[in-house]
Regions:
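Short, glycine/charged-rich beta-strand-loop motifs at protein surfaces that mediate ligand recognition
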Residues: 151-157
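Cleavable N-terminal export/targeting peptides
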Residues: 1-18
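Transmembrane beta-barrel domains of bacterial outer-membrane proteins
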Residues: 13-151, 163, 167-195
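Active-site-adjacent loop/helix micro-motif of nuclease/hydrolase catalytic cores
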Residues: 159-161
């Protein structure tokens, strides 16, 4: 059970850190930007990588060197929690950078996650925050297709209010897909593949 809980938690979020010496390719798309992020994890404690983004809000394209560090992980017999620090720096414009925290707690059945990020650029600084709650409608075995039904609420300070919407997440093996939608924020999509 402990091993499955550990594996489930590794896949429940688009993982900012992979297995030691592992690689991860992630893609994210929402109303503000589309991005692709590739990272390498020298250890389970941190990852380094490159994100390439097409910013729809500022009509710009840029990249970030990224660093993510696992501040805390707590495993119990029935749950796991993680807290991460993240940092990004544009190599062509040091005024464009970000930092933030995100974390999660989960069992095989329940999930709670949060994130907060401060972003800086030449045009307008902004913050992003979210809360996410989920339930697994069934408990699969290791290697099965797993499903999370979730509610996500998020706010970008460039917008005017919180947006809350349903999200469905599937993962199997080293592949994860997460899709959410509402008429305010449109599509919120995450893809991940680890190798």
């Amino acid at each position: 059970i402990f091993f499955f809980c550990l594996m489930a938690s590794l896949y429940s979020q688009a993982r900012p850190i992979s297995y030691p010496e592992g690689f991860t390719l992630m893609s994210h798309s929402d109303i503000y930007k589309d991005s692709v992020y590739f990272h390498y994890s020298p250890s389970f404690k941190y990852s380094v990588g490159l994100e390439i983004a097409k910013d729809d809000y500022f009509d710009d394209e840029y990249s970030f060197f990224r660093f993510t560090y696992l501040l805390n992980r707590k495993n119990t017999q029935n749950s796991q929690s993680n807290l991460y620090f993240q940092l990004g720096l544009d190599p062509e414009n040091f005024d464009r950078h970000f930092y933030g925290l995100h974390g999660d707690w989960e069992t095989r059945r329940w999930f709670v996650g949060f994130g907060y990020k401060e972003s800086f650029n030449d045009i307008e600084d902004f913050s992003e925050k979210y809360l996410q709650f989920g339930i697994a409608p069934y408990l699969g075995k290791y290697g099965d297709l797993h499903t999370w039904l979730m509610i996500k609420t998020k706010k970008n300070s460039l917008g005017d209010s919180w947006s809350t919407y349903p999200v469905i997440k599937f993962f199997k093996g080293d592949f994860l897909i997460e899709l959410g939608y509402n008429n305010k924020t449109r599509t919120d999509a995450h893809l991940m593949y680890r190798f």
